[in-house]
């Protein structure tokens, strides 16, 4: 049962991160198309957002391994 729970946690975390990253990059590209002079500021904000989104699947993997080894 723990194996299935771990797979679900890691899989849904990766799915959510992929969707979130896609939305962040989409917004950044649209913003750069509208205001090219803000390219560097938008890129910096995009990388911060991607870092925050990617933190959740990493935590999910850690929780999954804790469930697996308990």
From Swiss-Prot:
Q: Which InterPro entries match?
A: ATP_synth_csu_bac/chlpt, ATP_synth_F0_csu, ATP_synth_F0_csu_DDCD_BS, ATP_synth_F0_csu_sf, ATPase_proteolipid_c-like_dom, F/V-ATP_Csub_sf
Extract the Pfam families matched here. Answer: ATP-synt_C
Where does the record say this protein resides?
Cell membrane
Against CDD domains, the record matches this protein to: ATP-synt_Fo_c_ATPE
Record's SUPFAM superfamilies?
F1F0 ATP synthase subunit C (SSF81333)
Gene Ontology cellular-component terms listed: plasma membrane; proton-transporting ATP synthase complex; proton-transporting two-sector ATPase complex, proton-transporting domain
Q: How does it sit in the membrane?
A: Multi-pass membrane protein
**UniProt entry tagged with the keyword NADP:** no
Name the residues annotated as site: Reversibly protonated during proton transport: 54
Q: State any single GO MF term.
A: lipid binding
Q: Which UniProt keywords apply?
A: ATP synthesis, Cell membrane, CF(0), Hydrogen ion transport, Ion transport, Lipid-binding, Membrane, Transmembrane, Transmembrane helix, Transport
Q: Which domain of life is it from?
A: Bacteria
Residues making up the signal peptide according to the UniProt record: none
| Gene3D superfamilies in the cross-refs | F1F0 ATP synthase subunit C
Q: Which residues cross the membrane?
A: 4-24, 47-67
Subunit composition and interactions: F-type ATPases have 2 components, F(1) - the catalytic core - and F(0) - the membrane proton channel. F(1) has five subunits: alpha(3), beta(3), gamma(1), delta(1), epsilon(1). F(0) has three main subunits: a(1), b(2) and c(10-14). The alpha and beta chains form an alternating ring which encloses part of the gamma chain. F(1) is attached to F(0) by a central stalk formed by the gamma and epsilon chains, while a peripheral stalk is formed by the delta and b chains.
**Which family does this protein fall into?**
Belongs to the ATPase C chain family.
Its biological purpose: F(1)F(0) ATP synthase produces ATP from ADP in the presence of a proton or sodium gradient. F-type ATPases consist of two structural domains, F(1) containing the extramembraneous catalytic core and F(0) containing the membrane proton channel, linked together by a central stalk and a peripheral stalk. During catalysis, ATP synthesis in the catalytic domain of F(1) is coupled via a rotary mechanism of the central stalk subunits to proton translocation.
From the Swiss-Prot or TrEMBL record, give the protein name: ATP synthase subunit c
Q: What is the lineage of its organism?
A: Bacteria, Bacillati, Bacillota, Bacilli, Bacillales
């Amino acid at each position: 049962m723990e194996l299935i729970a771990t797979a679900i946690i890691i899989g849904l975390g990766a799915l959510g991160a992929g969707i979130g990253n896609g939305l962040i990059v989409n917004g950044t590209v649209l913003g750069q198309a509208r205001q090219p002079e803000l390219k560097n500021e938008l890129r910096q904000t995009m990388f911060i957002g991607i870092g925050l989104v990617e933190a959740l699947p990493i935590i999910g993997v850690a929780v999954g391994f804790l469930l697996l080894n308990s």
